[in-house]
């Protein structure tokens, strides 16, 4: 019946009965037959796979689903569109995938860093480094690890650390520390940390409370530092860290103003109830809802460390989102209001002005000033509006457009920014500052005397900011309105009489109270009636003059000004952040035209063309600095003497330049006589003139003497024979006197006569030919010989010991070279070169001084009564009570009494806001250490930038060698016992001790740090009696001694230090002082030596100097021909010290020649050069260099400089020899005449 075969196995699913089918069904596609058991196993595998990977979502279809997602958000409105794409979500995704280095840092930190828990909250961290666990001392709590929590920790309060040894099982899995900290970027939990100028910094806002104890790692995962805290420094945060030095000793580096970064919650107080400062108890306790209570809460926590958190919580506790960069910085000033204060010059005289000027700060560069007024900017009565300013129009608050505001000095100022009570403007120079505005037909202005100057940056006195130039550090007022750590003191306003609250109602004085306000009244008619009312009140007085009404305003703060009366009773103070605080920035300064430089022999001529007054400073780089300092404002030419020790000049804002003189000269010391004279005349003009005059005088005297002797001798000889007829003239006399003899005895007869009569003259007669022969030989020798060579004595630098000792000059860049010889081994070349040297004294900070600011609180006015002063702990605090002030009715305080009124005036000193960027530090300096960075090469080993201590005791490990250098031959330092550091400059200055500063001089304001409470001040502050018309606190005091010192401080040490020292800071040090010599000792390992049998043996050496310029930087070239036993390398060195060879070794073949360069100061160098174990002598003549002045120091010593060349000596000897011949001839003739005359007489 069914066309299909019967199944031999039970089916997997029941088969439904099938309907009638065509006996010829359609054909189906062929499929491979699957065995039943295999099918069951496959189905089981699929079921297990589905259970295992059920969480894996199926792959979406390729086409339609993707197309459906795109048009889905299109019909939706714009508002939901913003919600679906919040910017923080994208930033969060980026943070989830840190970089490779940060991932490694986070991995190492998570394994070796353990949180410290306090009350279940992470308060800080402890890390395991080098087998020890380190925990910040200021972080309270317990380490979240059972084994580490059980360790007994030792306290090191000087480093703010606790430490202890970790268990043995954990020592193999700890972080390793390193003392290597090259400048660059390092890693920590929050990303990159920048290390520069010996300080770790991060961008501001990165890291904070709770990060104390986290490690800073390098790229190898080694701990470089442990974070303890930080200090905000403008746009970056300086980290307080603990590091390790090269000896493994812990070093703490804490920047000024740093705070510990533990997460301990700071508590605030309100009505004897403590609460977290970021969570006020009346949450949401907003200023809008409870203004008076909020101000009271802030006043009671004025000195709290978390005052900023409390202020932010009180101002921003509402959930309404605020616009970033606008209300974020403006909302806190809604706690304050403008006020009316006294102005000494309102254009028409003294008045109570709505825009009175409280203070002007102009210590920034480029003409920026900050003005504080009694009006407010960027605020209206109903909120924030940058286009408006508000002021007190009588007793009401009024707002107008900010465009009606102006400021001027000698010309209108440019308003840069404004916020709260403050204006930031850029003004031209002037002697007064005026601020005003136009309110309809009314004009309000206030002018005060304040000198505004354009303060240029650097060493050029330009008058306008340049368009381009050089970037230099300067002080500016930041344009930001954000919190910068400076505060302005506020308080609730005092009571001021308001006549508008009083009126007559049925012959009685009625007090009208505004809605929602309170009024305090005081009446005397004749009984005293006083009280406070929140509603209208009618008194028994019948005259308005008998009552005073005061509107109580406790919902707003005002500035704590000396021009406003203080409230009655105990008043608390508040504070708000000051905008536009001074910060360190970069300013563009002018760059004077480069001087035209002219070089002559040992002379430097500068042709200067300044565009404005420009400072020129110079100094010599030797023992006597001979510093000069002059302001050049007109084109001029200056001439300076330059020696081989070096000369430095600094022109304007250009970097300093150093030059050195070379032994140059015109002519040729080895040429003809006129060339020799020209050469020495250019180098030694006076000596050459004296020498030439002496030679000329000798020649003239010799010639005259010889001629006179010869003439006199001839006359003496001939005269007797002329007088005697038929006299016989001897043959010799006839020959000498050109006389033709008629008859003469022969020679034998004459000699016989002398022998018998006078034997002395016989021997004299015999010696005459010998003398003539000697004179002829001497003249011949002077004509043909070049003169004797110079004898140069120098010490050998070779050493024959395993431990090599020597002495090298303390000059940076001048290498010390030697061949270290050891018996049985080939010589090893040794080279030590100083890269930098540092003289680091022990500096103890005595105090910090800066410009002071006189704080004048609101005075206390007591009507019809007396008040008294109370002592307060403020620097230079002055308090005085003045009686009989503000007479009846019309006085500034509106008192009833005539003479019984009193005022308590107060004033004291505090640091100015500029102290954060403009201060001087007074240090006491003691004997310090000397450090050096050296490059060492011995054999084939080369070591770069090795740090060593120059004390003769501390060895430095240089590979397998051990180097000990020092101490210096001269215990010298450029620092006096007292130095002052101002900015990047250092001054030797005898400052007064702490607590002994005098008014008007350096040290009139002293403190240990910029934030400490040990402030000392002596400013000769004196309070004066107030005038009756207005409420104010007059005073007098001495000008700032710090500002006076800045004007008269003179030249910094960097411009006058001898020996070419460069003064640097952080730490205080003198670098590269070329003073004294440095002994050294180095132990070279055996592996650096090679057996002498393994090195080539050199023979048949011949050295020839092909070209030589003496006193120049490797200006000599010589060629050495050789024969070697085998090919190889040989060190070369000149042990004589006359020449310094540039090359250290040469590669030798079996035979050939090689060329080397050398530097020498000798005109006739004759030095020995050692090649392996063989020695050859190189001789030759050197020419003078063509360049008079160069910008590099000499590479040789000046000890062997020859004063006179051999050629000059030869010409001099020829000259003197020829002159002496004339004298000898004259003497011979005189002797002959005397002999003849004597013989004739006998």
From Swiss-Prot:
It comes from the Viruses. Residues 37-70 are annotated as: Host transcription inhibition. InterPro entries: Alpha_E1_glycop, Alpha_E2_glycop, Alpha_E3_glycop, Alphavir_E2_A, Alphavir_E2_B, Alphavir_E2_C, Flavivir/Alphavir_Ig-like_sf, Glycoprot_cen/dimer_sf. A motif (Nuclear localization signal) lies at residues 67-70. One of its GO terms (cellular component) is virion membrane. Residues 1-36 are annotated as: Necessary for nucleocapsid assembly and virus assembly. It holds the Pfam family Alpha_E1_glycop. Residues 98-112 are annotated as: Ribosome-binding. The keyword Chloroplast does not apply. The chain crosses the membrane at residues 689-709, 760-780, 781-801, 1219-1239. Its EC number is 3.4.21.90. The record marks 186, 219 as: Involved in dimerization of the capsid protein. Keywords: Capsid protein, Cleavage on pair of basic residues, Disulfide bond, Eukaryotic host gene expression shutoff by virus, Eukaryotic host transcription shutoff by virus, Fusion of virus membrane with host endosomal membrane, Fusion of virus membrane with host membrane, Glycoprotein, Host cell membrane, Host cytoplasm, Host gene expression shutoff by virus, Host membrane, Host nucleus, Host-virus interaction, Hydrolase, Lipoprotein, Membrane, Palmitate, Phosphoprotein, Protease, RNA-binding, Serine protease, T=4 icosahedral capsid protein, Transmembrane, Transmembrane helix, Viral attachment to host cell, Viral penetration into host cytoplasm, Virion, Virus entry into host cell. Glycans are attached at residue 272. The modification Phosphothreonine is found at residue 113. Residues 66-104 have a biased composition (Basic residues). Residues 83-113 are annotated as: Binding to the viral RNA. GO terms for biological process: fusion of virus membrane with host endosome membrane; proteolysis; symbiont entry into host cell; symbiont-mediated suppression of host gene expression; symbiont-mediated suppression of host toll-like receptor signaling pathway; virion attachment to host cell. Residues 325-688, 745-759, 802-1218 are extracellular. Residues 710-744, 1240-1242 are cytoplasmic. Residues 717-737 are annotated as: Transient transmembrane before p62-6K protein processing. GO terms for molecular function: RNA binding; serine-type endopeptidase activity; structural molecule activity. A motif (Supraphysiological nuclear export signal) lies at residues 44-51. The record marks 261-262, 324-325, 744-745, 801-802 as: Cleavage. The keyword Hydrolase applies. This is Structural polyprotein.
């Amino acid at each position: 019946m069914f066309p299909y075969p019967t199944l031999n196995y039970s089916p997997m699913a029941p088969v439904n009965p099938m309907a009638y089918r065509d006996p010829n069904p359609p054909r189906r596609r062929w499929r491979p037959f699957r065995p039943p058991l295999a099918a069951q196993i496959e189905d089981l595998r699929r079921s297990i796979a589905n259970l295992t990977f059920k969480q894996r979502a199926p792959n979406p279809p390729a086409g339609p689903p993707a197309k459906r997602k795109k048009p889905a958000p299109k019909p939706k409105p714009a508002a939901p569109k913003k919600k679906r794409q919040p910017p923080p979500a994208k930033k969060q995704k980026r943070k989830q995938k840190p970089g490779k280095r940060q991932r490694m840092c986070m991995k190492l930190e998570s394994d070796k860093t353990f949180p410290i828990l306090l009350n279940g909250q992470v308060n800080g961290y402890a890390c395991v480094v080098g087998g020890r666990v380190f925990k910040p001392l200021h972080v309270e709590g317990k380490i979240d690890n059972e084994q580490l929590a059980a360790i007994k920790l030792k306290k090191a309060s000087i480093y703010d650390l606790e430490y202890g040894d970790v268990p043995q099982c954990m020592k193999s899995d700890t972080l390793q520390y390193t003392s290597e900290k090259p400048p660059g970027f390092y890693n920590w939990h929050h990303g990159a940390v920048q290390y520069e100028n010996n300080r770790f910094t991060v961008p501001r806002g990165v890291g904070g409370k709770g990060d104390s104890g986290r490690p800073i790692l390098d790229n190898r995962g080694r701990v470089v530092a442990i974070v303890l805290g930080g200090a905000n420094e403008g746009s970056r945060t300086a980290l307080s860290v603990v590091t390790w030095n090269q000896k493994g000793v812990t070093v703490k580096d804490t920047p000024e103003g740093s705070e510990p970064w533990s997460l301990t919650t700071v508590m605030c107080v309100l009505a004897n109830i403590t609460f977290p400062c970021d969570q006020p108890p009346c949450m949401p306790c907003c200023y809008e809802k409870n203004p008076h209570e909020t101000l009271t809460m802030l006043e009671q926590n004025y000195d709290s460390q978390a005052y900023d958190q409390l202020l932010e919580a009180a101002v921003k506790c509402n959930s309404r989102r605020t616009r970033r960069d606008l209300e974020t910085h403006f909302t806190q000033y809604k706690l304050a209001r403008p006020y009316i204060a006294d102005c000494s010059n309102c254009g028409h005289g003294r008045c109570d002005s709505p825009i009175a000027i409280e203070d002007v700060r102009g210590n920034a560069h480029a003409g920026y000033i900050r003005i504080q007024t009694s009006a407010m900017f960027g605020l209206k009565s109903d909120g924030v509006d940058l286009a408006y300013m508000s002021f007190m129009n009588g007793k009401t608050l009024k707002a107008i457009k900010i465009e009606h505001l102006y400021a001027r000095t000698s010309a209108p100022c440019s308003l840069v920014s404004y916020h709260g009570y403050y204006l930031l403007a850029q003004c031209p120079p002037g002697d007064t500052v005026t601020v005003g505005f136009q309110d309809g037909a009314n004009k309000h202005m206030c002018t005060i005397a304040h000198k505004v100057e354009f303060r240029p940056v650097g060493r050029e006195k330009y008058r306008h900011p340049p368009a381009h130039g050089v970037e230099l550090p300067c002080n500016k007022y930041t344009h930001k309105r954000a919190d910068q750590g400076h505060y302005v003191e506020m308080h609730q306003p005092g009571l001021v009489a308001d006549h508008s609250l009083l009126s007559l109602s049925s012959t009685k004085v009625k007090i009208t109270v505004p809605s929602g306000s309170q009024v305090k009244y005081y009446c005397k008619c004749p009984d005293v009636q006083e009280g406070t009312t929140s509603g209208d009140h009618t008194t028994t007085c019948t005259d308005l003059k008998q009552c005073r009404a005061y509107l109580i305003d406790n919902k707003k703060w005002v500035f704590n000004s000396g021009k406003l009366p203080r409230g009655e009773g105990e008043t608390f103070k508040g504070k708000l952040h000051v905008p536009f605080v001074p910060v360190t920035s970069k300013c563009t300064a002018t760059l004077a035209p480069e001087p035209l430089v002219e070089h002559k022999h040992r002379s430097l001529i500068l042709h200067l063309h300044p565009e404005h007054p420009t400072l020129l400073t110079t100094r010599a780089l030797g023992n006597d600095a001979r510093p000069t300092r002059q302001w050049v404002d007109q084109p001029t030419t200056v001439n300076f003497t330059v020696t081989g020790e070096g000369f430095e000049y600094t022109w304007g804002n250009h970097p300093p330049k150093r030059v050195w003189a070379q032994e140059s000269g015109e002519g040729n010391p080895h040429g003809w006589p006129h060339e020799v004279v020209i050469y020495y005349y250019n180098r030694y003009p006076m000596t050459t003139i004296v020498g030439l005059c002496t030679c000329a005088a000798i020649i003239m005297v010799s010639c005259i003497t010889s001629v006179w002797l010869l003439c006199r001798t001839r006359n003496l000889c001939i005269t007797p024979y002329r007088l005697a007829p038929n006299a016989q003239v001897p043959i010799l006399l006839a020959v000498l006197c050109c006389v033709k003899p008629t008859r003469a005895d022969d020679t034998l007869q004459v000699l016989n006569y002398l022998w018998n009569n006078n034997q002395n003259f016989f021997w004299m007669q015999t010696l005459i030919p010998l003398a003539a022969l000697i004179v002829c030989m001497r003249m011949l020798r002077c004509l043909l010989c070049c003169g004797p060579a110079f004898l140069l004595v120098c010490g050998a630098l070779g050493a024959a010991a395993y431990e090599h000792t020597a002495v090298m000059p303390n000059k940076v860049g001048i290498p010390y070279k030697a061949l270290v010889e050891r018996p049985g081994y080939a010589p090893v070349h040794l080279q030590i070169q100083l890269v930098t040297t540092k003289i680091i004294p022990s500096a103890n900070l005595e105090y910090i001084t800066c410009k002071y600011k006189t704080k004048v609180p609101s005075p206390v006015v007591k009507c019809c009564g007396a008040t008294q002063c109370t002592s307060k702990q403020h620097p230079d605090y002055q308090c005085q009570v003045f009686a009989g002030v503000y007479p009846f009715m019309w006085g500034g305080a509106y008192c009833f009494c005539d003479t019984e009124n009193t005022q308590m005036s107060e004033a004291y000193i505090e640091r100015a806001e500029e102290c954060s960027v403009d201060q001087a530090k007074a240090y006491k300096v003691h004997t310090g250490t000397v450090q050096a960075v050296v490059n060492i090469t011995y054999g084939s080993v080369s070591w770069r930038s090795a740090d060593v201590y120059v004390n003769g005791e501390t060895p430095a490990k240089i590979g397998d060698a051990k180097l000990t250098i020092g101490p210096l031959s001269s215990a010298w330092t450029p620092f006096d016992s007292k130095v002052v550091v101002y900015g990047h400059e250092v001054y030797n200055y005898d400052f007064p001790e702490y607590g002994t500063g005098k008014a008007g001089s350096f040290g009139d304001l002293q403190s240990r740090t910029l934030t400490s409470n040990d402030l000392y001040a002596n400013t000769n502050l004196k309070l004066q009696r107030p005038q009756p018309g207005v409420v104010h606190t007059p005073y007098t005091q001495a000008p700032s001694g710090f500002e006076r010192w800045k004007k008269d401080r003179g030249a910094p040490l960097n411009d006058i230090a001898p020996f070419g020292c460069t003064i640097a800071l952080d730490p205080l040090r003198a670098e590269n002082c070329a003073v004294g010599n440095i002994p050294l000792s180095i132990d070279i390992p055996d592996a650096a030596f090679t057996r002498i049998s393994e090195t080539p043996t050199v023979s048949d050496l011949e050295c020839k100097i092909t070209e030589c310029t003496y006193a120049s930087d490797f200006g000599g070239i010589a060629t050495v021909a050789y024969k070697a036993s085998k090919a190889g390398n040989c060190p070369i060195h000149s042990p004589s010290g006359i020449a310094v060879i540039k090359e250290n070794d040469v590669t030798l073949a079996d035979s050939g020649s090689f060329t080397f360069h050398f530097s020498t100061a000798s005109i006739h160098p004759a030095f020995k050069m050692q090649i392996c174990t063989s020695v050859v002598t190189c001789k030759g003549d050197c020419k003078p260099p063509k360049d008079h002045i160069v910008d590099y120091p000499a590479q040789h010593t000046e000890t062997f400089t020859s004063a006179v060349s051999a050629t000059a000596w030869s010409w001099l000897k020829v000259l003197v020899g020829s002159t002496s011949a004339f004298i000898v001839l004259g003497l011979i003739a005189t002797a002959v005449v005397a002999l003849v005359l004597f013989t004739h007489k006998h």
